């Protein structure tokens, strides 16, 4: 596959919390779409090993959701650290998108970018500085055409790959209902 500057990199992280100064990344997944939002590649879905003290420091919400999904067990069993996750992810991305070409795509990607900047700087640097944030479209639709919101329901699994797939489907939905371009 030849890398294409028009392809889009979609990313989702699962973290132990919302504060990059104290919380850590525990899962990463990436997908690549063409400019028409067709999925053309799935990157590795990586649970990132964290010590038990990091996992024990998670709040109740994170303990519950990441426990029920099996992510905590996958993190404990994982042999991958953050540097290995970065290397594997970039090796995948290089097949589809040149460095610096794609905005960071997903839902609430500003939060993901904060964690990448702190713990996976090389991966954060792979993206263009711009974001394609589906949550921005959602906020606009909620205010300007709230009736459209009822046509798309998210599952909110808080599993990185499923969350990205849902973000792409959500943008496809908004594209069909809102954008006439």
Curated annotation (Swiss-Prot):
Catalytic site positions: 129
Alphabetical keyword list: Cytoplasm, Exonuclease, Hydrolase, Nuclease
Superkingdom, natural source: Bacteria
SUPFAM superfamilies: Ribonuclease H-like
InterPro entries: Exonuclease_RNaseT/DNA_pol3 (IPR013520), Oligoribonuclease (IPR022894), RNaseH-like_sf (IPR012337), RNaseH_sf (IPR036397)
Record localization: Cytoplasm
SMART domains assigned: EXOIII (SM00479)
Pfam assignment, any one: RNase_T
HAMAP family noted in UniProt: Oligoribonuclease
Cited PANTHER family: OLIGORIBONUCLEASE, MITOCHONDRIAL
Protein name: Oligoribonuclease
Organism: Shewanella sp. (strain W3-18-1)
